[in-house]
Amino acid sequence: MKKTIFFSVLSLIVATTFLSSCSKYDEGSKFTLLTKKSRMVNNWHLTSITQDGLALNMSGISLHMELMKDGSATNTLSYTVLGQTFEDVAVGTWEFNDDKSKLVLTETGATISDEYTILKLTKDEMKTEQIDPSTGSVSVNTWNTK
């Protein structure tokens, strides 16, 4: 009986430690069998932006980001002004920072990279945060797969 209780308590401690260490993202799943890279590699569609806690109106704007397994990235911004639709495409690379807490995007030919703190990362949803160093403004972006 004492051995059973001991092993039950030990199993609970090990499981709690294991499950609590599986996610580094505040809003993410606590356990997944998919690697962070396999969750990040996807076709992402920006569904919402909040800036300093206020939701921004995204009507007439569409941002699509494709992150490939080889580290390449393509961002496609579509927007409509006075009934005319425009599209801008930027190519570059993506990577995680050393502890995989941030997504780092670098446009081809750019000298500066954009860093986004990852708040949530599942196979279907990603939430990132970026702080503008010059203004201190905080933007939270929510992405879903298409």
Please give the residue ranges for each predicted region.
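Short non-domain terminal segments
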Residues: 4-5, 16, 29
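Core hydrophobic alpha-helical transmembrane segments of single-pass membrane proteins
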Residues: 11-14
